[in-house]
Amino acid sequence: MVAPVIPALNDSEIERILDAAAHAGVKEASYVLLRLPLEVRDLFREWLMANYPDRYRHIFTLIRDMRGGRDYDSQWGTRMKGTGPMAWMIGRRFEIACEKLGLNKRRSKLTTDHFARPKRSGQQLSLF
């Protein structure tokens, strides 16, 4: 998992992270764009201003461009990857790097072979 991807701050490291992961034996990879729910938004702003004040406005402009003009998008289907040209570009870079490294060729299939139905119907099972 490459996360969080922060535009104009660490998105340039996607390929290097995936390369290191592939060399370590990883077969599947995914990414998540930076998410800024209310609980962390102000903390991230303070950290960014303290550590990268010259990039603050640019990074937040890109984040808002990928989040429909807001700092955070909670919508299913867009909250992890974002929307718009920059989100598309980050997604394509990730996909191309995965293809070059042979990642995500085959997704593991979920199996129910080891699932066993509870023996007692209607009663709560014991914890011990």
Q: What are the language-model segments listed below?
A:
Residues 4-5, 81:
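Short, contiguous strand/loop micro-motifs
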Residues 6-11:
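Acidic-and-aromatic substrate-binding clefts and catalytic sites of carbohydrate-active enzymes
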Residues 2-4, 33:
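A cross-domain feature marking catalytic cores of carbohydrate-active enzymes
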